[in-house]
Design a protein with these regions (language model features):
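An N-terminal assembly and electron-transfer interface module characteristic of large anaerobic redox
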Residues: 1-263
């Protein structure tokens, strides 16, 4: 509404249907609720709906050609040549892929250092995990206690024997990958941030608990009533448990070492 009041010419609000498909999966769909946001806004602001630019974007191999054609149609709508829109779309896709590769390379380089000390993987959907007004300063709370806070999408893909082919949601696949890291590396813990009434997250919660049986983990659910105090208490308790487990592990190692010396 603020943008409409500023009398902008257009608002770019695409339907992002599918992201790149992760190896081992058959689809990489985004959230069905967020995909329909452009339609909801169009219905809510009928008198200015012509200002909304809502192309359908899919980044999987099956949809990329259609996406490029959408850029051409978008160009015609704003009064420029179709080929200009297509070329602009191709440049945008190239920059996006370059950024992803640099981001993943950064993750690969940092992984060895991150494994040396207790770290918390923050897993969830990017529109929940990243905006500070939504995540209620969760990364800062973790870092302030001396832990690394690792976004789940920074982690390189771990090959697992588990068949996840029925999982068609891109962000849920990222969470699955994070679970594999927690199971494989003792210094890695996970904080799963979920949205209230999210269907895929509701299913993922049960899988999450089964996979991490015996592990220390944190599950946070965000809704309109979530406040700093509740987050602070739960995250603090989670980190306290991690610290206690490490203290007990250190005591056990020292005890075993002393027994060896005495023997």
């Amino acid at each position: 509404n603020d943008l409409f009041n500023q009398n902008v010419d257009y608002i770019f609000l695409p339907h992002v249907i599918e992201l790149e498909i992760t190896p081992g999966y058959i689809h990489g769909y985004t959230c069905p609720s967020t995909t329909t946001i452009p339609d909801i806004i169009r219905a809510a602001f009928e008198n200015v709906s012509e200002k909304l630019l809502t192309p359908h974007i899919g980044l999987s191999e099956d949809l990329i050609e259609t996406t490029i054609k959408e850029f051409g149609r978008l160009a015609l709508k704003v009064g420029i040549e179709e080929k200009v829109g297509i070329n602009a779309g191709l440049v945008a896709l190239s920059h996006y892929r370059m950024f992803r590769e640099l981001y993943y390379e950064f993750g690969r380089k940092k992984l060895k250092d991150l494994l040396k000390k207790p770290s918390v993987i923050i897993a969830g959907r990017p529109y929940v995990v990243y905006p500070p007004d939504v995540n209620i300063a969760l990364p800062r709370k973790i870092v302030s206690r001396g832990y690394n806070a690792i976004p789940a999408d920074l982690l390189p893909l771990l090959i697992s024997d588990t068949n996840h082919s029925r999982n068609v949601w891109s962000f849920t696949q990222e969470i699955n990958n994070a679970l594999e890291y927690v199971k494989k590396y003792p210094n890695f813990y996970i904080c799963f941030v979920s949205c209230f009434s999210c269907g895929p997250d509701g299913t993922m919660y049960h899988h999450f608990r089964q996979q991490l049986e015996g592990h220390t983990f944190c599950y946070l659910e965000i809704d309109s009533h979530t406040a700093h105090a509740g987050f602070e208490t739960r995250v603090g308790a989670f980190l306290d448990i991690i610290e206690e487990r490490h203290r007990n592990a250190d005591k056990t190692i020292k005890k075993e070492f002393n027994q060896i010396i005495v023997a």
